[in-house]
């Protein structure tokens, strides 16, 4: 894996009245720090079957690369990663199958590990996709599973993405979220610091580009809040360590300095599976019997 590349964001002198902004004060004086933003951004799509993950990934990429169709059964079978250049950055988009299903099976466990490998060393943003007007008990279970699988801290890197934005019929998404009587949705929006945006996945041209710009503003906000860092946990750290070890061993072999007896992929994937299993058990214990 390549090291993260960063670009420096020049600091401007803000207007005097902004010096009293309580949000900036609580964030630790971001204006006083030299901020970093990575050139390569990893965005991983999460959500229940039928939420529109793959279609949203296609909208972000500006082309149809992930299979997407209306179906009650999962269309995406395995995690996939595709990328595009946008505004001087490389956006890596990882589409996932229903890895947050409450029915954990060996197949789901393997799919989780595959998603971790594809998004290593960690995602800069998790895009939690849900259909407008359809935030149900199943979505609440997805939110809980997201925390069980990746850790409670993952919500600090999560953006709520509503699909079928066109159903607002010209109305405001802000008004919809603010006025919702769905308490679980309202709680989640507040927990995510109101990081939400909407996608009409049939949009083209400027409308599609405007949606992406809005999403990337939310991603940029996450980068500021986390000083440019991606999300990581034990499973991601283990994966990255193995990537680096493999690269080092391959380099030594090519230079005639090492042994060709490199541990196989199956061996370290078994280790990843065990670490992930233990992490999920710990996260589940931490969450206890909370509502989400």
Curated annotation (Swiss-Prot):
According to the UniProt entry, its GO molecular function terms are: GTP binding
The main location is: cytoplasm
Show the PROSITE patterns listed in the entry: G_AIG1 (PS51720)
* Expression sites by tissue: Highly expressed in spleen, lymph nodes, lung and placenta. Expressed at moderate level in thymus, kidney, heart and digestive tract. Weakly expressed in other lymphoid tissues. Detected in T-cells.
Entries under InterPro entries matching the protein: G_AIG1, GIMA/IAN/Toc, P-loop_NTPase
Q: Which Pfam families match?
A: AIG1
Query: Binding positions for GTP?
Result: 47-55, 68, 164-166, 201
Q: Which GO terms describe its cellular component?
A: cytosol
Q: Which UniProt keywords are listed?
A: Cytoplasm, GTP-binding, Nucleotide-binding
Q: List residues of the AIG1-type G domain.
A: 38-240
Q: Where is this region: Disordered?
A: 1-39, 250-275
The family line of this record is: Belongs to the TRAFAC class TrmE-Era-EngA-EngB-Septin-like GTPase superfamily. AIG1/Toc34/Toc159-like paraseptin GTPase family. IAN subfamily.
User: Could you identify this protein by its name?
Assistant: GTPase IMAP family member 6
The gene that this protein is the product of is: GIMAP6
């Amino acid at each position: 894996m390549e090291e993260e590349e960063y670009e420096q964001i020049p600091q401007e002198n803000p207007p005097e009245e902004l010096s009293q902004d309580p949000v900036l004060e609580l964030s630790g004086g971001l204006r006083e720090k030299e901020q970093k933003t990575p050139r390569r951004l990893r965005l991983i799509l999460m959500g229940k079957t039928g939420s529109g993950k793959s279609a949203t990934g296609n909208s972000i990429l500006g082309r149809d690369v992930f299979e997407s169709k209306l179906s009650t059964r999962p269309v995406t079978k395995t995690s996939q990663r595709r990328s595009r250049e946008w505004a001087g950055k490389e956006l890596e988009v990882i589409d996932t199958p229903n890895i947050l299903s409450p029915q954990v099976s060996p197949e789901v466990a393997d799919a989780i590990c595959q998603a971790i490998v594809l998004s290593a060393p960690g995602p800069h943003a998790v895009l939690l996709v849900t259909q407008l007007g359809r935030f149900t008990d199943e979505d609440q279970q997805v939110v809980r599973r997201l925390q069980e699988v990746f850790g409670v801290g993952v919500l600090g890197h999560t953006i709520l993405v509503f699909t079928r934005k066109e159903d607002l019929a010209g109305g405001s998404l802000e008004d919809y979220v603010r006025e919702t009587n769905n308490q679980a949705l309202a709680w989640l929006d507040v927990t995510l610091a109101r990081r939400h945006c909407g996608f009409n996945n049939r949009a083209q041209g400027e409308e599609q580009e405007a949606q992406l710009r809005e999403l990337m503003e939310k991603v940029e906000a996450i980068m500021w809040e986390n000083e440019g860092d991606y999300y990581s946990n034990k499973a991601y750290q283990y994966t990255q360590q193995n990537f680096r070890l493999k690269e080092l061993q391959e380099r030594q072999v090519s230079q005639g300095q090492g042994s060709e007896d490199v541990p196989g992929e199956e061996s370290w994937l078994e280790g990843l599976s065990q670490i992930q299993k233990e992490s999920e058990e710990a996260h589940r214990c931490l969450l206890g019997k909370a509502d989400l």
